Curated annotation (Swiss-Prot):
<dbReference type="GO" id="GO:0006109">
    <property type="term" value="P:regulation of carbohydrate metabolic process"/>
</dbReference>
<keyword id="KW-0460">Magnesium</keyword>
<dbReference type="GO" id="GO:0005524">
    <property type="term" value="F:ATP binding"/>
</dbReference>
<dbReference type="GO" id="GO:0000155">
    <property type="term" value="F:phosphorelay sensor kinase activity"/>
</dbReference>
<dbReference type="InterPro" id="IPR028979">
    <property type="entry name" value="Ser_kin/Pase_Hpr-like_N_sf"/>
</dbReference>
<feature type="active site">
    <location>
        <position position="144"/>
    </location>
</feature>
<keyword id="KW-0511">Multifunctional enzyme</keyword>
<dbReference type="InterPro" id="IPR027417">
    <property type="entry name" value="P-loop_NTPase"/>
</dbReference>
<dbReference type="InterPro" id="IPR011126">
    <property type="entry name" value="Hpr_kin/Pase_Hpr_N"/>
</dbReference>
<feature type="region of interest" description="Important for the catalytic mechanism of both phosphorylation and dephosphorylation">
    <location>
        <begin position="206"/>
        <end position="215"/>
    </location>
</feature>
<dbReference type="Pfam" id="PF07475">
    <property type="entry name" value="Hpr_kinase_C"/>
</dbReference>
<protein>
    <recommendedName>
        <fullName>HPr kinase/phosphorylase</fullName>
        <ecNumber>2.7.11.-</ecNumber>
        <ecNumber>2.7.4.-</ecNumber>
    </recommendedName>
</protein>
<feature type="binding site">
    <location>
        <position position="207"/>
    </location>
    <ligand>
        <name>Mg(2+)</name>
    </ligand>
</feature>
<dbReference type="GO" id="GO:0000287">
    <property type="term" value="F:magnesium ion binding"/>
</dbReference>
<keyword id="KW-0808">Transferase</keyword>
<keyword id="KW-0547">Nucleotide-binding</keyword>
<keyword id="KW-0723">Serine/threonine-protein kinase</keyword>
Amino acid sequence: MKKKLFVSELIKHFDLEVLNHDFPEIEDREILTPSIKRLGLELSGHFIYDAISGVIVGWGTNESKFFEKIGSEKAKSSIEEIFSRKIPMLVLSKGFDKNYYSTIIEIANKHKTPVIFYKASLSEINTILGIYLLQYFAKKVQVHGTLVSVFGMGILIVGDSGLGKSEAALELVQKGHVLISDDAVLVSHYGNKYFGKAPYITKNLIEVRGLGLIDILSVHGLKSVLPECEINFVVELKDYEQNKSNFDRLGNKVLKYQIGEWKIPKIEIPIRQGRSVASLIEASANMFLSKLNGHDVLAMIQERSLNDE
C-alpha cells in the first residue's frame, strides 16, 4: 500500500506558520511526491498535464520578481491558475515579497489551500523539507539481520540463525559501539545511500539465547543506541565448515549483498569456534575505512614484490 502524507502532518511535524490559518474551510490534502516544485513554465501559463497536482509548491525571491515584471493583473491570473491545479500547499520563503501576500491568501482561500511562511531561503526549505519527504516516501524493505554503528560506520550483520549476530552486537555495544536494530532491520534507499532503522516493537532491544531480551537503552544508556543510521556495508557471517572452499582469502573480490533490487558492498566472515566475531567486525570496519581513504593492501604487496626483484 502506498504511504500517505497529509499537509496537516507536515505542518505539525515542523510547526509551520500557516498564513491563512483563520480560514476554516482549508482542505487537508494529500502530498503525493517527495519534492518541492518551484515552477518555471507553469508560472507563464504552460502546463504539462497535471504535473503539479499533489506536489508542494515553493516560491521565493525569483518568483516575486517575476510577478513584479509581468504586472499585478497577469500575476493574479497566474496565481489563480496554479491554485486551480489542486496543489496541497504553497510555501513562501523569507525572500518572497510580502506585497503579494494578500492576493495569494485571497486566491488560496478560494481554493481551500494552506499558505505556509517558512523563515528560510527557498534552497534551505528544499533541503529541510525535501530530506524529510524523501525519508517519508522511501521504499522500505525488512531484512533479517542486526544493524550496528562501529567507528561511525553503519554495518548490517546478516547470516543464518545461530551464527551469533545478536551476541556479536551485544559485545560491540559493550566495547562502546552503537546498536540501531537487532533481528529485523527496515532498510530504505534514497539519494545514493542506504539507511536502516528498527521496527518500533523491537527498538533498542537485543535477544540473546539464554538471556532473553536485553533493553540496551536501560542497561547501557543513551550513548549505546541510535534510531537510524546509514548502512555503509554488510557483514555476512558464514559457517566455516560449510563454506571453507568458497572464502575470499585475499579480500580482492568485490562482493555485494542484494536486498530487493539494491546491492550493498559486502564482506564475508567465516565463523569458527573460538573466534571473536565482534573483533572481526571491528577489523572489517577499519579495513573499509582504510579502503575509502585509498589504501590498497594488495597493491602495496605487488609494489613490494616488484621492488624486491
